[in-house]
Amino acid sequence: RILGPAFSILFLVWFLSGLVMIYHTFPRADRADKRAKMDILSLENLPSLDQIEKRLPQNERISHVTLNSYLGQTVFHIRTEKGSYDIPADSTERLPVIDWNRIQRVASQWNTSSIAKVDSLYTLDQWIPFGRLKEEFPIYKFHFADPERHELYISSKSGEVLQYTDKNSRFWAWLGAIPHWVYFTSLRQDAELWIKVVVWLSGIGCVMCIAGIYLGIRDFRLARRRHLISPYKKFWYKWHHILGVLFGLFVLTFCFSGMMSLARVQ
């Protein structure tokens, strides 16, 4: 009676937004998009890994390596136990300076439409709500004057594209991913707080479902003494009771799995 009215609205939003997410998720500039903008790699004159390792600080061994070519420069992205390094394949080259000209070149790779305006962001917004991105400030937000109203976010520190959206993906995110994942900027930028809120909401929902299932089964047992299926005689009341218990089991698994997806357990 206490939790039901409030949490029924929350569950309704979760279910409906989950249906939307089958077809539309949170917009992002994913790896496939980024790869499509890269140059084709040439295998000629590439140094060996032994040569690259010699250009690392002493006593550091390569644990992971990625090689790509972008805007005319081939770079090894190296991870070791002590840190990460970006090393040009050509030892005579240096890594590019991330200046405004390079930022514009990156933007033109993603969208050739005219630019309506560019914002310099020093706070996170709805489409980059992740706290780790604060390290990239200022972030340049390009607004393109195309029919799809694309928006592109580029880091001023690395020159990397952080997000790419259009009006369609933003619209569906408001109906799907944002309410379903509780992706509100003020909450999501604090990852620890966001996890706690989702876990607590799911946990309280589990308690509510267990209580409802218990009471529903108890009423079934009481009704059996009078040779009835349900103690409720009115058609809608009776079927609300029966379907409520059955659907409550489903809602319980939904809440519990949502809670465990973020809960830190051994």
What are the residue ranges of the model-derived segments?
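Conserved histidines in hydrophobic membrane contexts and catalytic metal-binding motifs
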Residues: 1-266
